[in-house]
A protein has these predicted regions:
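Extracellular/lumenal glycan-associated surfaces
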Residues: 1, 76, 161-173, 177-178
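Histone-fold recognition with a strong bias for associated Lys/Arg-rich disordered tails
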Residues: 1-2, 145-148, 162, 183
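Proline-centric
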Residues: 6-11, 103-113, 129, 144-159
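Extended intrinsically disordered, low-complexity coil regions enriched in Ser, Thr, Gly, Ala
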Residues: 13-14, 174-183
Length: 183
């Protein structure tokens, strides 16, 4: 990168996304320890109660016996059918269960740093070259393809954390200014 934080000079490493992510495949039934969550483009992982409803719950049979996908705080979650709409984000909500139509990954790097990579326009555009499906509106990006994408990774976790914190602070400032404008 052209701009670096002071004290970091090591070259970034080109790696496959699959080198820094591991798919989480555990499923469970809904419980107090594992509440239902939702995943929405532009919002990320949110409590199910905050999702704008379109009566999807009536489509779910046996709500309390159905198994859902486990997600934990800082997992990377994406919707294979909606990458084109930015449906990839970090779980900032916490432990819970989401629909098994989504894909969840854990990471061995700083989650906020990996979030910035996978939510970037450039990354999402590169992911779209893997879209498959016979109907354009129903195309999806398989997780097996997504993890083959090359990414650049800061070799030191301290630098990753500084980058993640920097962008989190910018996001926070934007949110504050948006609220101020709405008043």
């Amino acid at each position: 990168p052209e701009i670096r934080f002071e004290g970091f000079t090591d070259a970034w490493e080109q790696r496959k996304l699959g080198d820094v992510l591991e798919r989480r495949i555990e499923q469970r039934q809904q419980s107090e320890e594992y509440p239902r969550l939702a995943f929405a483009s532009g919002q990320g992982v949110i409590p199910l109660s905050e999702r704008k409803t379109n009566n999807r719950e009536q489509l779910t049979k046996d709500e309390y016996t159905k198994k859902y996908l486990v997600t934990e705080l800082n997992d990377i979650v994406y919707n294979p059918a909606n990458v084109k709409y930015g449906a990839i984000d970090r779980n900032k909500c916490g432990r819970g269960l989401i629909s098994p139509i989504y894909v969840t990954f854990t990471t061995n790097e700083i989650p906020g740093f990996i979030e910035r990579i996978v939510t970037s326009h450039d990354f999402q555009q590169r992911a779209l070259r893997f879209e498959e499906g016979t109907v354009t509106k129903r195309q999806s990006v398989n997780p097996e393809d997504l993890v083959t994408l090359d990414i650049l990774v800061a070799p030191k976790r301290e630098e990753q954390q500084k980058i993640a914190t920097y962008f989190d602070n910018i996001d926070h400032l934007i949110t504050l200014h948006q609220r101020k404008c709405e008043e």
